Structure formats: C-alpha cells, structure tokens
C-alpha cells in the first residue's frame, strides 16, 4: 500500500503523441515483451469504453467556431483597406495579391488553431473532436474545412485564387465557392488516377537499383565519417531534425566534452545520448553512414546503424536495400491518394511578429536601420544587426532585441499601444519550401496616354524594343483620353490641339472612305453609316460633320515643320498646318493636288538657293503594285537633289530625280514576290495561274498570268506577268521583237483576231527553251503629266505688300529611271511623280549676295482671330515656339473668308466650352503602325475642376501689377494661366500677342524635357490697330512647370530674385484622396491641366506603382488601349508543394535529368577544379582527387533535395534510406582517354573502389571522371546480367552478355529469385558467398576529425587520412559547396 501511495495519478486526455512517448519509455524500461502486454490491456480498455459509450457521428456534431464571424469580418476590413491602397497607387498588384493571400491564410490558420480549444471547452466528448484529434480518422485540416472555413484554393496551374472560400462545409457553399472548390476536387481525382502509377513505377526502379544491398559484415573498418553540427555560422539546424539525424547512427569517432570522453567510436546513439549532446552543446559529432562504407555490393552493420523495426543494431543478412527502396517509394504512392483541397501554397506559415508588451514610446538608433518596403508594400526599416528597441512608458522601461534582417514597422519616437506589432521577423531560413520566379503581367484598365517620371529608364532595355526598366520605385500614369480613329478624322479639318464639338466618346464610329480616280477628275466619296439609332440628348446631328467632310474645299497638309530649337521636339511628334485651296467648282480645269502639300522647312529654318520649299504627291501617279517604268524614246536629264532636303515621311533620301521633258510615260504592272532560298514554291516556272492561286504555303497570287521564277543569290524572285500569250506566225513580224511598246490603233493584220489594240500594250518575248518561244502581250498604264500649277491657287497674294523678291518655280520629278523596276515595300503604295516648288530669288536684287533665306512666322490678331503667316525672307529671324490653336466658339464650317494660312484662334472662350458636354481638345500621335491617331482630352468625360480655393492669396505686387499692366489683365480675362505641359508641346501663355522677338533660355533639365523661361518683350496689336506699349512691370518671366512669378524690373530685383512657391504647379500629379484644400480631400487622381486664380482643372489619370526590377511596356507618351500590357513584375512565390508536384521532382533528381539541378556555379567550379588540380598534382593524383570530390558533393546535394520534397509534406524518411539509393547512383566512374590503361577501355563504367584497387594492383594510374547515373541506368549497369535483363531491354542485355561472355555470380536477391534458388539474405545469407579480402584489418587507423556536412549547414574542408596513397585510398582535400543542385 505504501508503494501504491507514491504512484502519481494522471488525469489527462491522452492523444497519439502522448501514446508514442509512453510506448517509447515502456520499451526503454521494460523491454519489448512486457510493453506489448501493457499495450494489449490498453487496447482492450479502449474497445470496452467505445462499446459502452456507443459514439455516433451526426451533422449536429459539426459545431462552427463562434469566433469565426468577427475573424472573417476583420479579414474583409483589411482586404478593403488593401484594395483602397491599390487604387490610390500605394501598392502594386503583386503586393496586393501577396498580402491578400496572407490575410486570408492567417485567418484560416487562426480558425484552425481555435478549433481544438473550442471543442475542449464546449464539448470534449464531441465525436468529431475525439475522432480527428485521436488520429483515428481525419486530420485537423479536414475537420477545419468542415467546421472552420475552406480558405484559399489553388487553380489547376497551382496558382493561388485571390477569392477565399469563407464558408465551411457545414454551412454550405455558394455557387461561386462551389465552382472554385471543384478545382481542388478535380485535381485530386486526376492525381489519384494518373500519379499513382507513377509512384508505383518509381518504387519498382528504386528497388531494382538496390535489391542486392544486404548487411554482410559487422564492421568494414572505415575511418571516414560525416560531421553533423546543430549550429553553424549561417543557419541553425532545427532540433527535431538534428535528433532524427543522429538517433540510430553509429559514432565514427570518440566524443569529448572537455577532457572527458562521453561516447566511444562504434557506439550506437540513442535518445539519451543525443539529449546529453544537446545539453552539453557539443560542437560537431562524427557519424558513420552508408556513404562511408568501404564496400560497394554490401553494407556493414556499423555503417547502417540501428534497425528501424527494433531499437538495436541491424542484424546480419538484413535486405536493407529493398527496405530503402520501399521506404522512399511508398509515401509517394500513399500521398497521391490524398486529395489536397487547399492547394498547400503556404506550407511554412506566416512570419513571426514582435508585439509591444504595453503602451509606450518607441526609441531606437536610427543609424543602424535604413528605410525599405516590406513584401506587402508597407514602409518599414530594415536592420542588419541586432537592434535594441526601448519602449518607454510612465513607470517602466522595457527593451526588446530585434534580430538581424528583420523589419521594424514603427518610427522612432512613435507612441505604440499594447499588443501592437512593432517588428516582423523574417521566416527561418531553414524551410523546405519551393520558390519559383513568376512573371505577373499588369494590364491597363483604361485607354489613354502613358506618362512616367525620371525614375524609369527612358532608353529601352534592348535596341528596337519598347521595354523599359524601373530602377527605383515610381508611379506610372495613364492620362485619360478617348481615341478617335484616323479614318474619320483624316478628311476633317481638325489638327493637333484643336477644340472639337464631335462627341467621339458617345457613339461607336463606322465609316467607309474610298478614292476613285477617273481620268483627270478626282472625286471623293465619303460614306457615313448611321452612327446610332437612339439620339441621346447632347449629341449633335451629324449633318454638320458630313457638311465638313463632303464639301471638302480644303486640303490636309501633313507637313513636318522643324523648328530652330529642335531639341525641344519629340522625334515622333509633328505639328500640322493647314493651307486652303479654292473650291473644286472654281478650278475644274486646274490641277487639284488631293494628297496635300508638304512644306519642308529645314531643321535650322535656313533655305539655300534652288532648295525645295514644298512638294506634293498626286494620287493619280500612285501605284499599289510593283512594275517597270518606261519613257519610250523620251530623253531625261537627271537633277541631283540638294543634300539639305528634309526626309519626307521617313522615306530614305532619293539619290536622283528625273525631270520630265515631255508629258507622257508608261507603267507596266507586274506582281513580284521575293522569297528566301528555302521557300517551298508550289507553282512551276513558265506556268499560267489564276487569281488567288497558292504560290507558297503563306502567299496567294493577287493577279493571274504567267509565272517566272529566277533564282538569285540566297533568294528567289518570283514574278507574275498578266496579259495575253501569243504564238506568232512567220507573218507576225512585230511580235518577233521583245520589249517594245505598241501604241493604240496598230492591229494584227494576219491573225485570227482582227480587233485593233485599244490601249498601249507592251510586247515581251519569252523563251522557255532554245527552240520554242512565245510572246507575252502585257497591259500598260499610260500617264500624262499635267500642266504647271497656278501658284495663286496654292498661296494667297502677298498680304504684307512686300516686294516680291522670292520666286517659286514648279518642277515635276519622275522618281524612277527609265526601265527601272519599282518595288513596293509590303502594302505601301509607290509614288511615280512628285511635283516640287523650288525657291529662288532675284539675282538683280541688292541682297543677292545672300545665299540663304530664313523662314519665320508672323501672327496678326483681328476680331479675335489670330492669323499666322509663314514668311520666307532674306533676313535673319527665329522660329522658337509652337502655337496653340483652337476652333472658334461657333465651330462648324469655317467660311472661306475666315480661312487664312496657318490660322489660329484665341482660346478666350474655348477652355470654358471644353468642359461642357461635347467639347474636347484633340491630341495627335503616330500609333504603332505609323498612322495618325487622335486622342480626345480636356473634355467633360475625362477632366474635372477643383475649386474655387478661397484661401489662396497672391502677393501684393502681383495684384498691383495686374491693375497697372494691361497685358496681365488681358491674360486674366482669357481664362487659364496655362495649359498642359506635355513632351515637346510648349504653348504660349499669352494668347493675344504678336511675337516679334522671343528668346528661349535653357533653364533646367527635367523629365527628359527642357524647362522654358519665356521672356515676354513684345507689343500687343489689337483689332483697331492700336499698339499697347509695354509696362515696366510686364517683364514677367513665366516658368511653365511651376507657374512661379519672377520680376525682372530693377526695382524688384533685390526683393524677388527667389522663387515664390505656390500651392499647385502645372503638370503636377495628384493621387486620389489627397488634401490640397481646406475643404477636404479631392476624390479623383489626375494631372493639373489648367491653373486659374481660384481653381484648377485636372485631367483624370490612373496611377500604377512599379517597384525596382519591373519592366514597363511601351514608350513615353504612347497611346495605350484597354487591356494592353503595362508592366511585368518578376517576383518569387512559394510553389504549391503537394507530393503530386514533388514526386516528379524526386524522380528528376534520382534519374539525374533535371535541367536546373546542377547549378552552373558548381559545375564551373568542379570543371575548374578538375582542370587546375590536374596541373598541380599531375595526371593520376589530379583525376583521383577530382573524382572523389565530385562524388562527395553530388551525394550530399541529392540527399538534401529529396528530403526537401518529403519533409515539405510532413513525411519523415530516415536519411540512411536515401543514402543507400544515392550511393548506388554515384558509385561509378567513367574511364577517360587521358593516360590509356591496358585494363579498361575509355568510356567504360567501373566502380570507384574497383578502379582504385586495380590501380594499386597494376601500379599504374587509371584516369577517370565521376559520373552520375540515373536509377534506370544504374539498374542496367550492375554485376548481374540476369537482374538487368529482368528489368528492361531483355533481348539487348542478354545478347550483349552472351557476346562478352559475362559470368553472373548470383550475389543479388533478384537473380536468385529468377533462377529459383535461395536468396542470400536473412538466414541464407552465408550460402555461396564469395569472401572479400580482409585487407582493411591491416590498415593502421589514424583517427582525425572529418567534417562533411550532410545537411543544410556549411560544408567544411575534409581530410581523409591514410597511411599511404596506394595502400587504401587517397588522402584528399575536399572543399564542399552549399546550395547546389545536381543533375
């Protein structure tokens, strides 16, 4: 009774883990037999209690966790805040996705952790609780889906779906949640069907490669060992893995703590000894593994260690190879049957947080941290070393140490509340998570114009690419605007920066335009379909538009006008000017240049004598097809073009032009295809084809006719000649000639067809063979050159009534020589004739000594209409601005008397109108196809006004100057202080000025543009002809980027030399919800377009955040459409790590065929090592050391990679099983060609130990290199051909063995099973064994510490010591590398 009183009574619920510990203790204390007796009693007790209680499971037993409601609500609130931050441009899409997933993952995890305590408190005998937590059926994850929430799912590609399933199976799923959860179910069904066979085949191959490994000895006598240490310089090995690694192993060396020996060599390690090592903090423990065993075809007891079935050393005769193969293959088979509903993306859990213990103020050393962004886009401080953070409250000071590489989420001197997160500790580096680099494409939500800051590289990543790198965090902005198709605009009179009344954003456009050429008359047809059946209010009638387009009295000019300060212009931006023409009725007999005049002003604005001032191309002389130009007997003299001619439309400069002397030339059309040499041509030479015949795989013919194929250097030229084929008689003399033109009216007198030729024809003789020939009659297009143009129709009279000292001469050029072929590039048309206006001036003039003339603009204001004229004079002038033009307020058809060259209208009422319903300013671009494209901006749909700001006060001097100075008064009346500043569009800020003189000063380089200071030193001419003298105060310098005022008058120079900062600057960007006025935050993000005295107008813009390393698609100022790729983010994500995706990885590693499994770094190092060590040590030593080094490194890498996959699934496989497999696939070497030996052939595979022993026996060096065999190749390269033949390729293996006369010694298990004999394992392992030499007993063992890290920590230098080099093995210096993958 006394003894019983001392017994401790435990009244606790016992779970699976506690039972395991109890059994382990019982075995240690009482042994196996007594323990089994105790466990029988426990089992009987359990059955009796289960029968008595009769537990059943019903749907009411599934109790939802009460805290679920507010946890989900809290997660939704965080997601809403995150969505707002993303909308404001504070976080980008990847950060948003990452944080959203972590928010819901953390919520799901909290619910899962709440589940067990909730059951324990509310209903400890709940059947669901008892079943799931006893391990009888179901696990915590499955029960969590029943009573918690299903959480996040992965799609079939393994990517995370952003939408979590908030319901559990007890509450029921919505339709959306059901469809999302079906992804996981389908994946599970497919995995069960498909992957199980893969896992089974993997098991078969694994068993095949190691079936002959049996424990044959107690001790092989090795002195090598592998060092395992719990802690290193870089990383900690977790304690459970350290214990699992050591338990059951045998020590390779004595262990000393101080001077006391606590464990001996060849002693097996139990849990007690391992715990003692951990307690005493032993630095490194040297253990024996299958890698260190000195045999190839068997293994000794000490190198294998304890048997997993009973806690003692493995018995002799144990078939440990088959056990190893089954241990690795079987978990894969089991795990494929398990369905993974959650996708298992976050296998490692969330990061650890440091929380404040109570309220107080934070203090830390700011020099030890630097600002950064967390992976969720939050601002934080990163500390590189241990950082001490002090929390001061009223009565206590608490210090917290933050480990290195952690994020500090609070600022210095910030007040924190109790339990507030102050730091985030990075996850432990020892994780088994798969990381993969993923590209995330961000697409544009709306159409508009791209804008970025100087933080993006303006030069693209590669030449001719449109990808730009982001070196630091910055915003991309899409400035809103509605695109207008060029088909509708191209016949209207609207140009860049015009105001428009047509509502392009309201209706869809459908327009068909066609040009028909009838003789000399050019008629234009414009067909406009009904734009919309329902006419909405505010949409004007389209008769006004048709009036503009149909009665096209005016001609469009697409001129490239370059200014003196051309560095301010974007290369792709061109300003458009308008030149009026008389109506068609007035010039019925006149030449009407429909395609428009292009005025070519040189870059510097200087014309030389006889230089081309303008040119235009008549569409009548334009051909779509290729062909040959013929003048007949017409002579032509070539005119060399001036070198300073501007390139027109990006076409290369013409070397020569041909001036026509008579008025007719001919064009003979033909279809030409130039094909690469390797093309497959599907038609024969000199064959006749129809229209739309397939010529090659991708090309069909446009015309029918005769095929002619010419093979030239590296290309094939295929021509199709349309026309008639004639076989001439002897009487047809005219057809015996080749290459002649026949005028109309000449018939064929003696042929069957007596019809005369209606048009010109071209006769060409074709000779397929020497004897045969025929004649091809081809149609000819005849062109007449029109008379010279009346210059009065092009340019009005001299309005300034100056002396006419500059003449314009009309010259027609033919752009191709006689007989030269014309070739069209893709679908472009070919211009045959160009009419040019050549500048010349009177030689009798006094200024004739001047060899150059300058072009400049003159602007005159009358009745609110500003008229711009271009003057070409022999005086020096400047071209230094681009004019802002808008339509008049009553914009419709502009009457002829208002049409002056280069008109421009004061935007006095234009800006106010532009914000009404259907007004807008258009901007002109060249799109990706180099076509003109318009963007509608400054309309009510994409702009908004902020203000008025009542609290804005201007300086008194400005107010006084406004009173005194009429100039600023006019400017105030004209509406805005400024308009938008884009790339190269610098507008005049004072719209009613005639600019006689203007100086441009380079002020500051910003954003790849020049900031401009405009010094306004000019006179104002009003419509009454009065000239307002400028006031001293009017020397105002305007900085368009900041709208600050400078006064240059001497009285104010000392007071106002500095900038006076204002609240809002022009062109500035505002994010949404930003406070810029006292009234509160404004609601939209945008760019400041107009600044007025009391309000601002913003153009809507959408911000996108880009972090370093992102790639921006598209160029600055380019139009983007909805759905275009905007940014590519490259980031690392955790791959879904279930075993079905891990198994192929295990197979890749074991079959040594994965591409990325040898890191290039290691491969280069090993190659370098082999190369240089051979030079240092000589041929034999270098090869042996290099091979041993490579084998050791690859073995360690392979073990780590395989363990990563299984540990990520929570599957524990002992390292020794993997080591046995890996030892077999790394035990062979490849005989190399250097130093030919008489024993082995180059390229032969032999075992490493065999190579060493043969070298010692023959006393000559055998050169070899390490090689990694896959498990399949290793199975086919064994000592037994019977085993190989029974695996695969039976006929080949047996035939080869017969030819070579191989002998099978029947050492393995499989060959004995095949032949029906007893297997050499278990009790029969002693039968028929060939005893190996006992050479190892003579070796003097030198005990040294060998350090080789098998696991994730650093590997150190290894020294293998032997007495002599050729006696046993080589003493090698092995440098090991970390973080490599082997293939």
Swiss-Prot record:
<protein>
    <recommendedName>
        <fullName>DNA-directed RNA polymerase subunit beta''</fullName>
        <ecNumber>2.7.7.6</ecNumber>
    </recommendedName>
</protein>
<dbReference type="InterPro" id="IPR012756">
    <property type="entry name" value="DNA-dir_RpoC2_beta_pp"/>
</dbReference>
<keyword id="KW-0862">Zinc</keyword>
<keyword id="KW-0804">Transcription</keyword>
<dbReference type="GO" id="GO:0006351">
    <property type="term" value="P:DNA-templated transcription"/>
</dbReference>
<dbReference type="GO" id="GO:0000428">
    <property type="term" value="C:DNA-directed RNA polymerase complex"/>
</dbReference>
<dbReference type="GO" id="GO:0003899">
    <property type="term" value="F:DNA-directed RNA polymerase activity"/>
</dbReference>
<keyword id="KW-0934">Plastid</keyword>
<comment type="subunit">
    <text>In plastids the minimal PEP RNA polymerase catalytic core is composed of four subunits: alpha, beta, beta', and beta''. When a (nuclear-encoded) sigma factor is associated with the core the holoenzyme is formed, which can initiate transcription.</text>
</comment>
<feature type="binding site">
    <location>
        <position position="300"/>
    </location>
    <ligand>
        <name>Zn(2+)</name>
    </ligand>
</feature>
<keyword id="KW-0479">Metal-binding</keyword>
<dbReference type="GO" id="GO:0008270">
    <property type="term" value="F:zinc ion binding"/>
</dbReference>
<keyword id="KW-0150">Chloroplast</keyword>
<feature type="binding site">
    <location>
        <position position="220"/>
    </location>
    <ligand>
        <name>Zn(2+)</name>
    </ligand>
</feature>
<comment type="function">
    <text>DNA-dependent RNA polymerase catalyzes the transcription of DNA into RNA using the four ribonucleoside triphosphates as substrates.</text>
</comment>
<dbReference type="InterPro" id="IPR038120">
    <property type="entry name" value="Rpb1_funnel_sf"/>
</dbReference>
<dbReference type="GO" id="GO:0005739">
    <property type="term" value="C:mitochondrion"/>
</dbReference>
<comment type="similarity">
    <text>Belongs to the RNA polymerase beta' chain family. RpoC2 subfamily.</text>
</comment>
<dbReference type="GO" id="GO:0009507">
    <property type="term" value="C:chloroplast"/>
</dbReference>
<feature type="binding site">
    <location>
        <position position="303"/>
    </location>
    <ligand>
        <name>Zn(2+)</name>
    </ligand>
</feature>
<keyword id="KW-0808">Transferase</keyword>
<dbReference type="GO" id="GO:0003677">
    <property type="term" value="F:DNA binding"/>
</dbReference>
<dbReference type="InterPro" id="IPR050254">
    <property type="entry name" value="RNA_pol_beta''_euk"/>
</dbReference>
<feature type="binding site">
    <location>
        <position position="293"/>
    </location>
    <ligand>
        <name>Zn(2+)</name>
    </ligand>
</feature>
<keyword id="KW-0548">Nucleotidyltransferase</keyword>
<keyword id="KW-0240">DNA-directed RNA polymerase</keyword>
<dbReference type="Pfam" id="PF04998">
    <property type="entry name" value="RNA_pol_Rpb1_5"/>
</dbReference>
<dbReference type="InterPro" id="IPR007081">
    <property type="entry name" value="RNA_pol_Rpb1_5"/>
</dbReference>
<dbReference type="Pfam" id="PF05000">
    <property type="entry name" value="RNA_pol_Rpb1_4"/>
</dbReference>
<dbReference type="InterPro" id="IPR042102">
    <property type="entry name" value="RNA_pol_Rpb1_3_sf"/>
</dbReference>
<dbReference type="InterPro" id="IPR007083">
    <property type="entry name" value="RNA_pol_Rpb1_4"/>
</dbReference>
């Amino acid at each position: 009774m006394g003894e019983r009183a001392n017994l401790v009574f435990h009244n606790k619920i016992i779970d699976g883990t506690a039972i395991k510990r109890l059994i382990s203790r019982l075995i240690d204390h009482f042994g196996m037999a007594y323990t089994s007796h105790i466990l029988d009693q426990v089992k009987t007790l359990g059955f009796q209690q289960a029968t008595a209680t009769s537990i059943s499971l019903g749907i009411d037993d599934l109790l939802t966790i009460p805290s679920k409601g507010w946890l989900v609500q809290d997660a939704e609130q965080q997601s809403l805040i995150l969505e707002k931050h993303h909308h404001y441009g504070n976080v980008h899409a990847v950060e948003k996705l990452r944080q959203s997933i972590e928010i819901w993952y953390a919520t799901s995890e909290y619910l899962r952790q709440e589940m067990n305590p909730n059951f324990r408190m509310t209903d400890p005998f709940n059947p669901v609780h008892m079943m799931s937590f006893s391990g009888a059926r179901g696990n915590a994850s499955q029960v969590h889906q029943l009573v918690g929430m299903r959480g996040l799912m992965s799609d079939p590609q393994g990517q995370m779906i952003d939408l979590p399933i908030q319901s559990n199976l007890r509450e029921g799923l919505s339709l959306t949640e059901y469809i999302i959860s079906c992804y996981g179910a389908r994946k599970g069904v497919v995995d069960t069907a498909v992957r199980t066979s893969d896992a089974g085949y993997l098991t078969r191959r694994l068993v095949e490669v190691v079936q002959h490994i049996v424990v044959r000895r107690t001790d092989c006598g090795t002195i090598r060992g592998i060092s395992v240490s719990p802690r290193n310089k870089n990383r900690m090995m977790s304690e459970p893995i350290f214990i699992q690694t050591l338990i059951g192993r045998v020590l390779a060396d004595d262990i000393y703590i101080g001077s006391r020996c606590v464990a001996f060599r060849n002693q097996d390690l139990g849990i007690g000894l391992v715990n003692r090592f951990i307690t005493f903090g032993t630095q490194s423990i040297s253990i024996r593994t299958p890698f260190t065993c000195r045999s190839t075809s068997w293994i000794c007891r000490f190198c294998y260690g304890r048997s997993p079935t009973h806690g003692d050393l493995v018995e002799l005769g144990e078939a440990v190879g088959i056990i190893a193969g089954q241990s690795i293959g079987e978990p894969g088979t089991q795990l494929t049957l398990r369905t993974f509903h959650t996708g298992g993306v976050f296998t490692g859990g969330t990061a650890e947080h440091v929380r404040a213990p109570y309220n107080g103020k934070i203090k830390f050393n700011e020099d030890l941290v630097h600002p950064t962004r967390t992976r969720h886009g939050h601002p934080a401080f990163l500390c590189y070393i241990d950082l001490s953070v002090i929390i001061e409250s009223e009565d206590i000071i608490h210090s917290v140490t933050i480990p290195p590489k952690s994020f500090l989420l609070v600022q210095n001197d910030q007040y924190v509340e109790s339990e507030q997160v102050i730091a985030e500790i990075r996850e432990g580096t020892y994780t088994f998570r798969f990381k993969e680099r993923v590209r995330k494409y961000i697409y544009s939500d709306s159409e508009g114009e791209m804008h970025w800051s100087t933080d993006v590289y303006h030069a693209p990543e590669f030449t001719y690419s449109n990808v730009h790198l982001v070196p630091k965090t910055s915003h991309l902005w899409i400035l809103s605007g509605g695109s207008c198709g060029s088909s509708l605009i191209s016949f209207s009179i609207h140009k860049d920066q015009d105001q428009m009344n047509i509502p392009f954003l309201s209706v869809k456009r459908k327009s068909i335009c066609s040009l028909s050429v009838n003789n000399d008359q050019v008629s234009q047809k414009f067909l406009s379909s009904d734009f919309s059946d329902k006419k909405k209010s505010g949409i004007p009638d389209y008769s006004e538009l048709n009036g503009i387009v149909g009665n096209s009295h005016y001609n469009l000019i697409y001129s490239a006008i370059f200014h003196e300060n051309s560095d301010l212009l974007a290369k792709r931006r061109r300003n458009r000017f308008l030149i009026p023409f008389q109506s068609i009725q007035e010039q019925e007999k006149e030449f009407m240049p429909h395609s428009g005049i292009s005025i070519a002003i040189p870059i510097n604005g200087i014309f030389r004598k006889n230089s081309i001032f303008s040119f235009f191309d008549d569409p009548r002389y334009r051909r779509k097809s290729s062909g040959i130009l013929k003048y007949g007997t017409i002579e032509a003299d070539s005119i060399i073009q001036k070198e300073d001619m501007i390139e027109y439309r990006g076409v290369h400069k013409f070397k020569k032009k041909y001036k026509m002397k008579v008025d007719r030339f001919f064009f003979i059309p033909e279809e030409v295809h130039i094909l690469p040499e390797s093309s497959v041509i599907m038609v024969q030479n000199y064959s006749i084809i129809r229209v739309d015949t397939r010529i090659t795989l991708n090309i069909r013919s446009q015309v029918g006719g005769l095929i002619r194929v010419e093979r030239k250097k590296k290309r094939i030229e295929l021509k199709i000649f349309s026309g008639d084929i004639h076989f001439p008689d002897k009487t047809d003399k005219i057809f015996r000639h080749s290459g002649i033109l026949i005028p109309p009216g000449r018939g064929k007198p003696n042929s069957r067809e007596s019809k005369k030729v209606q048009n010109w024809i071209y006769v060409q003789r074709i000779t397929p063979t020497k004897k045969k020939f025929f004649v091809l009659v081809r149609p000819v297009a005849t062109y007449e050159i029109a008379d010279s143009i009346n210059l009065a129709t092009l340019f009005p009279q001299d309005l300034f009534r100056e002396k006419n000292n500059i003449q314009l001469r009309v010259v027609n050029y033919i752009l191709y020589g006689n007989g030269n072929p014309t070739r069209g590039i893709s679908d472009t048309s070919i211009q045959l004739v160009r009419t040019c206006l050549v500048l010349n001036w009177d030689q009798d003039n006094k200024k004739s000594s001047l060899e150059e003339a300058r072009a400049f603009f003159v602007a005159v204001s009358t009745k609110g209409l500003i008229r711009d004229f271009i003057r070409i004079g022999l005086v020096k002038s400047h071209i230094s601005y681009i004019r802002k033009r808008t339509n008049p307020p009553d914009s419709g058809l502009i009457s002829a008397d208002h049409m002056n060259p280069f008109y421009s209208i004061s935007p006095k009422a234009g800006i106010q109108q532009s914000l009404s319903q259907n007004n807008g300013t258009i901007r002109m671009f060249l799109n990706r196809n180099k076509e003109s494209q318009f963007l509608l901006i400054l309309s009510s749909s994409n702009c908004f006004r902020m203000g008025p700001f009542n609290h804005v006060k201007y300086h008194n001097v400005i107010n006084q100057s406004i009173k005194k100075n009429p100039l600023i008064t006019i400017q105030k009346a004209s509406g805005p202080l400024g308009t938008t500043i884009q790339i190269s569009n610098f507008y005049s800020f004072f719209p009613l000025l005639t600019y006689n003189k203007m100086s441009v000063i380079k002020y500051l380089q910003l954003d790849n543009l020049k900031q401009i200071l405009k010094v306004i030193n000019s006179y104002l001419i009003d419509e009454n002809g009065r000239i307002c003298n400028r006031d001293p105060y009017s020397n105002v310098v305007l900085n368009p980027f900041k709208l600050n005022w400078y006064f240059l008058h001497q009285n104010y120079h000392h007071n106002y030399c500095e900038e006076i900062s204002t609240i809002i600057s022009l062109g500035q960007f505002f994010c949404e919800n930003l406070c810029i006025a006292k009234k509160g935050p404004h609601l939209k993000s945008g760019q400041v377009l107009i600044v007025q005295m009391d309000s601002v107008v913003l153009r809507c813009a959408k911000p996108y955040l880009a972090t370093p390393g992102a790639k921006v698609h598209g160029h600055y100022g380019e139009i983007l459409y909805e759905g275009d790729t905007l940014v590519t983010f490259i980031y690392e994500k955790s791959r879904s790590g279930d075993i079905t995706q891990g198994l192929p990885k295990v197979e890749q590693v074991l079959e040594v065929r994965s591409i990325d499994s040898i890191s290039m770094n290691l491969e280069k190092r090993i190659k370098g090592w082999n190369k240089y060590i051979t030079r240092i040590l000589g041929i034999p030593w270098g090869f042996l050391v290099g091979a041993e080094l490579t084998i050791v490194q690859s073995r360690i890498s392979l073990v780590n990679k395989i363990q990563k996959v299984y540990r990520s699934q929570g599957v524990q496989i002992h390292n020794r099983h993997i080591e046995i497999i890996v030892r077999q696939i790394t035990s062979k070497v490849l005989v190399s060609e250097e130093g030919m030996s008489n024993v082995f052939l180059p390229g032969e595979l032999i075992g490493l130990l065999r190579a060493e022993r043969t070298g010692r026996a023959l006393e000559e060096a055998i050169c070899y290199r390490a090689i990694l065999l896959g498990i399949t190749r290793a199975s086919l390269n064994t000592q037994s051909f019977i085993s190989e033949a029974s695996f695969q390729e039976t006929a080949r293996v047996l035939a080869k063995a017969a030819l070579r006369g191989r002998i099978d010694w029947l050492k393995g298990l499989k060959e004995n099973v095949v032949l029906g004999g007893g297997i050499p394992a278990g009790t029969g392992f002693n039968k028929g064994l060939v005893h190996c030499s006992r050479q190892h007993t003579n070796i003097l063992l030198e005990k040294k510490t060998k350090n080789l890290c098998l696991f994730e920590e650093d590997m150190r230098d290894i020294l293998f010591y032997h007495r002599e080099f050729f006696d046993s093995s080589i003493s090698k210096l092995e440098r090991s590398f970390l973080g490599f993958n082997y293939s």
